[in-house]
Every structure is written in structure tokens, then in C-alpha cells.
UniProtKB/Swiss-Prot annotation:
Keyword annotations of the record: Cytoplasm, Isomerase, Nucleus, Rotamase
InterPro entries (UniProt xref): Phstyr_phstse_ac, PTPA_C_lid, PTPA_sf
Family stated for the protein in its record: Belongs to the PTPA-type PPIase family.
Protein name in UniProt: Serine/threonine-protein phosphatase 2A activator 1
Organism: Yarrowia lipolytica (strain CLIB 122 / E 150)
The encoding gene: RRD1
Chain intervals with Low complexity compositional bias: 396-412
Bias type Basic and acidic residues, positions: 366-389
Catalytic activity line of the entry: [protein]-peptidylproline (omega=180) = [protein]-peptidylproline (omega=0)
GO biological process, one term: mitotic spindle organization
EC numbers for this chain: 5.2.1.8
Gene3D superfamilies in UniProt: 1.20.120.1150
CDD domains on file: PTPA
Cited function: PPIases accelerate the folding of proteins. It catalyzes the cis-trans isomerization of proline imidic peptide bonds in oligopeptides. Acts as a regulatory subunit for PP2A-like phosphatases modulating their activity or substrate specificity, probably by inducing a conformational change in the catalytic subunit, a direct target of the PPIase. Can reactivate inactive phosphatase PP2A-phosphatase methylesterase complexes (PP2Ai) in presence of ATP and Mg(2+) by dissociating the inactive form from the complex.
CC per GO annotation: chromatin; cytoplasm; nucleus; protein phosphatase type 2A complex
Length: 432
């Protein structure tokens, strides 16, 4: 195997189309399906005692990264966009990555670290943008898949191992988010599924899907739907009970911890999903949503890079895929300063075309227009005062024969819930 540093290959919408025909895309879909089917009817184990040795090693690695957070406290004082101390944490992680991987997996091919470390680092959020989102989760899943491909993790991970590895990771990144106030990456705001995550909802819903379910029985309730229906997420007490054994409920519990107010207001999509009859239908919708909103969105997958072995930029038949080079992209035309023209237009002396400026940087033309308006208003007010003083009814509130104007109010919303007209709520894939 010849490993190489992962490179950017997705720079345009056309590259996303190529990505959908690539080996990495097929691998990621396969991992999602495999992990989902593996964890069906399984609970998150209370500890790692029954895990394979290699799985325990990965769990230990994640916990060491968590300990680094304790060694790197956030900077004091208010911050609007994340705490820059997370960059120090990233620096420490990057400096220790080779040692952490070789300690966890003594048989690792040292050459593979150049590719593996990219997906590990990417799974911890953005060092530059101080954010965390679904693209970072994708990177960590690629890291786990890479370990499997190299034989460092079992190819067929048992359900307890899948659940415990990913829940340990989710606990780690939630700690990162809370400690360093990481922003949501590419969030859809209130109309997104979750500010930061998607994978726990896929794996957690899969846990409550019966193996007897088929494509034609997605809406037929099973014992899992009757024992703990999807609507249970609206009950904080049940959420607390379920979060220790189910990844979906653990993610919901995190939302309850960090958000206040009615659930249907801050998480309307998850609220709508809670009304679906079966977990099988929810899981099916979560997969479709992930494919569309994560794997199919340029802002997310543009940060997924490609090496030569683990995730090569090749199609499923092994052929190299085309990609847009940065220099091929349409350059952004800079805006010309006020008063200047492009080279195609006749150029005059620039300062001769600039407007005369008045107070506070306003053009004198604007200042004069505002002064005229204020003068006209003052004249009208003076005329009204004189009118009232002379006993005129003009402008007198409640005067006989005067018609009262209705109070001004905003036009009614055309969307339930008060959204602006035309801003219909995003429908989930499972919505009919």
C-alpha cells in the first residue's frame, strides 16, 4: 500500500456529483447500513468490559483526547464565536496523534498514519472555524472505517463495540462543544434536525428496529414501538431512563441539557418526528436525510479529503475521477469603489465623480434631502398646532365626526407558527 496525504477534490457542485460515483461514497453508505443492521435490537452496554481488545484501545484513545480538554481550559471572558483555546487543544492532539495511534494499535503501518490522522483530526471539529457539525461526524466514521480496512479493528464489529465506540465519541465531542462553545457547522437553524449531530439519531433509531421488519412493514408497530414509542422523547423522565442504553435518547437528553423552552419551538423537526408511529420508519427517514443533507451537500462534503488508499478519489471500478482545480473556479469580481468605472468604460478623474461628503460620511445630497424633509415636517406640525389653538377640529383626537383609524398591525402569517410568508417548514424525508 502506498499512502499519501489526503487532498481536496470537492470544489464545486460538479465534484459532488463525481463524489456520488466514488468508492468512498459507496464505502460510507456501506458503513451506515452495516452499523445500523448490526445494532438492531441491541442496547448500549454499561461499560467496555465485553468489547474486543482493539475496540477498547479506540475507546481509550478517545478518553485520552477527553483528558486533553481538562488540561486545556477555555480562555476567560465572553466570546461570540467559540473559544480560541480549542485551537490549543487541537495543537496538542495533533502533536500526540502518532504516539496515540501507535500505542493503541501497536501493529499499525506507520505509513498509514498520514491518512488515518486526517480523519481523526477532522472528526473533532474545525480548528479554524471553531465549529462542529455533521461533516465532522462523517470524518470520524471514516476514521473508524479506515481502522477496519487496515485490520486494526474487527471487520465485523459486534453491536456492543459499535455502540460503545460511537457513544464514547459523541460524549467527547459534546464535551468539546460545551467547553469551547463551538458553533454549529452549516446549521439549518431551527429547521435543522440537530445543531451538531445526525449519526446518533441513525444508530439510536436502529437500536429500536426489530429484525423482523421489512420494507413493506415499516409502519407496522413492533414490541419496541409499543414498549417505548417515538413520542417518548417528549417525556424528560423517560429520556433520562433511556439515555444510558440508547444513542437516540442520549442525543435528545443533550438537547434538554443545553436548550430551554418548549421542545416543539427549539427542535421542531425532532418534535414532528416524535409523532411517527414506528422506529423503523424513523430510521429509514434518517438514512435518507443523511444521504441528502450530509453526503449530498457541497458545504458539508467539500471538507472531506481523499488519500490514495483508504478513501481514494476513484469510481467504483477503480478509475480516477475528474475534479475541479481551484484555479478553474470562476474568480469573484471585486466591487469597484464608488465613482470608479471598469476599464471597459471611459475613465474620468476619480475624485471628480465622488459625491461631496457631509457629516458622518453622508453625501451632501443626502444631507440636503433630509434637511428639506425635516423642514417640511416642522412646517406641518406648526400649522397643526396653530389649527388646534384656533379651535379647529383638524387633527383633534375624538373630535365629532372624526373617523378613527384602526391600529396598525403586521399582516397575518401565511405559515402556521408565525413564519414569514413563503417560508414553509422543511419536510423530513418520511413526511408524506
Amino acid at each position: 500500500m502506498t499512502f499519501s496525504e489526503p487532498q481536496k477534490r470537492i470544489s464545486s457542485a460538479a465534484d459532488v456529483d463525481s463524489f456520488k460515483r466514488s468508492q468512498p461514497y459507496a464505502t460510507i453508505i456501506s458503513l451506515l447500513d452495516k452499523y445500523s443492521s448490526t445494532v438492531q435490537e441491541h442496547l448500549l452496554p454499561p461499560n467496555e468490559d465485553e468489547l474486543a481488545a482493539s475496540s477498547k484501545a479506540l475507546v481509550t484513545l478517545c478518553r485520552k483526547l477527553s483528558a486533553l480538554i481538562d488540561e486545556t481550559p477555555p480562555l476567560e471572558g465572553p466570546r461570540r464565536f467559540g473559544n480560541v483555546a480549542v485551537r490549543d487543544w487541537h495543537d496538542k492532539m495533533e502533536a500526540q496523534t502518532t504516539a496515540l495511534l501507535t500505542e493503541a494499535f501497536p501493529s499499525i503501518n506507520k505509513d498509514s498514519i498520514i491518512e488515518l490522522q486526517y480523519y481523526l483530526h477532522g472528526g473533532m471539529g474545525s480548528k479554524q472555524r471553531l465549529d462542529f457539525g455533521t461533516g465532522h461526524e462523517l470524518s470520524f466514521m471514516a476514521f473508524v472505517g479506515g481502522l477496519q480496512k487496515l485490520g486494526l479493528l474487527e471487520t465485523d464489529l459486534p453491536a456492543p463495540d459499535v455502540l460503545f465506540i460511537f457513544e464514547t465519541y459523541f460524549v467527547l465531542v459534546r464535551k468539546l462543544i460545551m467547553t469551547y462553545s463551538l458553533e454549529p457547522a452549516g446549521s439549518h437553524g431551527v429547521w435543522g434536525l440537530d445543531d451538531h449531530s445526525h449519526l446518533p439519531y441513525i444508530l439510536g433509531s436502529a437500536q429500536k428496529v426489530s429484525r423482523s421488519v421489512t420494507a413493506s412493514t415499516l409502519l407496522v408497530p413492533t414490541k419496541y414501538d409499543k414498549e417505548c414509542p417515538p413520542s417518548s422523547v417528549m417525556n424528560p423522565r423517560i429520556v433520562q431512563q433511556q439515555k444510558t442504553t440508547n444513542l437516540y435518547f442520549a442525543a435528545i437528553a443533550f438537547i434538554y441539557d443545553i436548550k430551554s423552552g418548549p421542545f416543539y419551538e427549539h427542535s421542531p423537526i425532532l418534535y414532528d418526528i416524535s409523532g411517527i408511529a414506528t422506529w423503523a420508519k424513523i430510521h429509514s427517514g434518517m438514512i435518507k436525510m443523511y444521504i441528502a443533507e450530509v453526503l449530498g451537500k457541497f458545504p458539508v462534503v467539500q471538507h472531506f479529503y481523499f488519500g490514495s488508499e483508504l478513501y481514494p478519489w476513484k469510481d467504483t471500478e477503480g478509475n480516477d475521477l475528474p475534479y475541479s482545480k481551484v484555479e478553474d473556479e470562476e474568480p469573484v469580481k471585486p466591487k469597484l469603489p464608488l465613482g470608479f468605472k471598469s476599464k471597459k468604460e471611459p475613465q474620468t478623474t476619480p475624485h471628480a465623480r465622488l459625491p461631496l461628503m457631509g457629516p458622518r460620511g453622508m453625501p451632501m445630497e443626502t444631507v440636503e434631502r433630509l434637511a428639506r424633509r425635516d423642514g417640511q415636517r416642522a412646517a406641518r406640525e406648526k400649522e397643526e398646532r396653530e389649527d388646534r389653538a384656533s379651535g379647529g377640529a383638524s387633527g383633534t383626537t375624538g373630535a365629532p365626526g372624526a373617523t378613527a383609524l384602526p391600529p396598525t398591525r403586521a399582516p397575518g402569517s401565511s405559515v402556521p407558527g408565525g413564519d414569514a410568508p413563503g417560508m414553509a417548514p422543511t419536510k423530513a424525508p418520511w413526511a408524506k
